[in-house]
């Protein structure tokens, strides 16, 4: 259910684009993200840092799209977000010697240190590549194709990557020995 809640602004963006245009969809995405953050704050009295970053990016890039009436800005938004994720994953290791993937998952999964390092690097690489792919689709295809890619293509690739990571991780997880 949380996954669908996290997709709420993207789904509304897609629907608004299909019913109207990119500018209406952008305004809807900004409003939906504000509502989403408001709901999270109301329910939990806490908003995760990445949710604040996402709100800031949609407000800046979406706002620029609306004010300047130029869809290029909203098309850059996913790339900026992906590249920030990649930079955070790499930067946390290089600067603070902290593996963010490990910090998020180590309570659920026990893995050797080298596997954590490769997993962090794999996710950083995935996000960097997704940023490049988003730009490729944004500049080489129509706005409609980009909107479809934003919802279906990027989510599909994310799902495939998660499944591949799960299969790879299963080889490195300690086996449960029950007597």
Curated annotation (Swiss-Prot):
One of its GO terms (cellular component) is plasma membrane. The lineage of its organism: Bacteria, Pseudomonadati, Pseudomonadota, Betaproteobacteria, Burkholderiales. Keywords: Cell inner membrane, Cell membrane, Membrane, Transmembrane, Transmembrane helix. NCBIfam families: ispZ, PRK00259.1-2, PRK00259.1-3. The chain crosses the membrane at residues 3-23, 24-44, 49-69, 76-96, 121-141, 149-169. It holds the Pfam family IspA. Belongs to the YciB family. Plays a role in cell envelope biogenesis, maintenance of cell envelope integrity and membrane homeostasis. This is Inner membrane-spanning protein YciB. It is a multi-pass membrane protein. It is found in: Cell inner membrane. InterPro entries: YciB.
């Amino acid at each position: 259910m949380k996954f669908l809640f996290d997709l709420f602004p993207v789904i509304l963006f897609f629907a608004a684009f299909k019913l109207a245009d990119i500018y209406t969809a952008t305004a809807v995405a900004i409003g939906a993200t504000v509502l989403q953050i408001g709901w999270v704050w109301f329910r939990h009295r806490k908003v995760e840092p990445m949710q604040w970053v996402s709100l800031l990016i949609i407000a800046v890039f979406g706002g620029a799209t609306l004010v300047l009436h130029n869809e290029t800005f909203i098309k850059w938004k996913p790339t900026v977000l992906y590249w920030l994720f990649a930079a955070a994953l790499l930067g946390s290791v290089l600067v603070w010697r902290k593996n963010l993937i490990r910090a998020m998952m180590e309570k659920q999964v026990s893995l050797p240190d080298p596997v954590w390092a490769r997993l962090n690097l794999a996710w950083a690489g995935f996000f960097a590549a997704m940023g490049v792919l988003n730009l490729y689709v944004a500049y080489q295809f129509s706005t409609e194709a980009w909107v479809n890619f934003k919802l279906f293509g990027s989510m599909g690739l994310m799902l495939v990557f998660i499944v591949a990571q799960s299969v790879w991780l299963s080889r490195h997880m300690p086996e449960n020995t029950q007597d």
